[in-house]
């Protein structure tokens, strides 16, 4: 019987070593050589200190900053671990809200967000990405339209001209990949860092 099972056991061990150890290590080493910044998480440093990643959004809430998309990520409730509490941009629990388009809680949240944004900029249409969460809850980018929508608020809070901020948004806008894939986008962290550097 061992004679019949032996090839299966040898194959299992060989494939486990190959796909579970050799392949991941080889790909990690290759990525480190070809894409060193991305392989380390696309970390953004300022004054030698890591302040974030270009791949994970952050919860900017002050008027002087551009805000990202809403985040539906959660964390364990400190009082009752069987429940969760909102924890925007919690990378340890990447997820969307899983609320359907007819869910009252989702509808109410979106309406509240639209009302707040309309109060901020009554003359412009609210871009959809400022009131909807991404599937991961960690999206670091917004559309150029969403950034431009926020220009009056940020200009007022910073005492900068709207024209200067529009140029900053334009400078940080990225086109579709290869002209086809994805949508035009602005990385919120990079834009806010440039905003802090602007005088």
UniProtKB/Swiss-Prot annotation:
InterPro entries for this protein = KdpC
Gene Ontology cellular-component terms listed: plasma membrane
* Region annotation Disordered: where it falls in the sequence: 67-86
Transmembrane helix as a keyword? yes
The membrane topology of this protein is:
Single-pass membrane protein
Provide the alphabetized UniProt keywords.
Answer: ATP-binding, Cell inner membrane, Cell membrane, Ion transport, Membrane, Nucleotide-binding, Potassium, Potassium transport, Transmembrane, Transmembrane helix, Transport
Membrane-spanning regions, if any? 7-27
Q: List localization entries.
A: Cell inner membrane
One GO molecular function term of this record is: ATP binding
- Composition-biased stretches, type Polar residues, lie in 71-84
- The source's superkingdom equals Bacteria
| Subunit-level organization | The system is composed of three essential subunits: KdpA, KdpB and KdpC.
Q: Report the family membership.
A: Belongs to the KdpC family.
What is the protein's known function? Part of the high-affinity ATP-driven potassium transport (or Kdp) system, which catalyzes the hydrolysis of ATP coupled with the electrogenic transport of potassium into the cytoplasm. This subunit acts as a catalytic chaperone that increases the ATP-binding affinity of the ATP-hydrolyzing subunit KdpB by the formation of a transient KdpB/KdpC/ATP ternary complex.
The record's listing under PANTHER family reads:
POTASSIUM-TRANSPORTING ATPASE C CHAIN, POTASSIUM-TRANSPORTING ATPASE KDPC SUBUNIT
Query: Which HAMAP family does the record match to this protein?
Result: KdpC
Protein name in the entry = Potassium-transporting ATPase KdpC subunit
Species the sequence originates in: Rhodopseudomonas palustris (strain BisB18)
